Amino acid sequence: MKKVFRLVAVVAATVMAATAFVAPATAATKVKVGLAYDIGGRGDKSFNDSAAAGLDLAKKNLKVTAREVTVTTGSDSEREDKLRLLAKAGYNPIIAVGFLYAGPIKKVAADYPNVSFGIIDDSSVDLLNVAGLVFAEEQGSYLAGVAAALATKSGKVGYIGGVRIPLLQKFEAGFVAGVKATKKSATVDAKYV
């Protein structure tokens, strides 16, 4: 639960930081945040839900308006279409959830230089109007590893990652480091599904 709360807090801070790119809102100009989810969208019980929770906090606390879009096929062209839809509709900033948006956001941001974009889990886009929103994921999973090491009676713990990608390998590395720092003799069985 603490990990989820931390991620929600990070996403809320991300949305708040992204709105700092935009001129202060007045009664006549209200900040319109666009949020582009990856496959699964709101309700995925994962990264998209964390972004949604942050957006909900921004809507409540900052009084921003927002539009949410979700890709269904996962193609770069669909991601690009979703970003263009938000940019054409005047949303600024636009935040994309996940590194798979890197190529599409680079194209769209180049066409909309006066719109601020943010991309979660990627810092490869080198444009002035794109903020790479990357986090030290391994630090949170380190703490989870410490907790697992303290909880195990057998000296064995497991780590399950969804897909073997660099991001989840960072989670695994942090988790294993936390386990080993707490209980050197413990073994970690890591699997990806």
Regions found by a protein language model. Name each.
Residues 110-134:
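Flexible loop/hinge segments that line or gate small-molecule binding clefts
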Residues 1-11:
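Bacterial N-terminal signal peptides that target proteins for export
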Residues 76-90:
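Short, well-structured alpha-helical segments in soluble
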Residues 55, 142-190:
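An alpha-beta-alpha
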Residues 8, 17-25:
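C-terminal segment of classical bacterial N-terminal signal peptides
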Residues 90-98, 118-120:
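Periplasmic-binding protein-like
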Residues 33-61, 67-80, 98-101, 164-170:
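Extracytoplasmic "Venus flytrap"
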Residues 62-71, 183-193:
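Short beta-strand elements in bilobed, periplasmic/extracellular small-molecule ligand-binding domains
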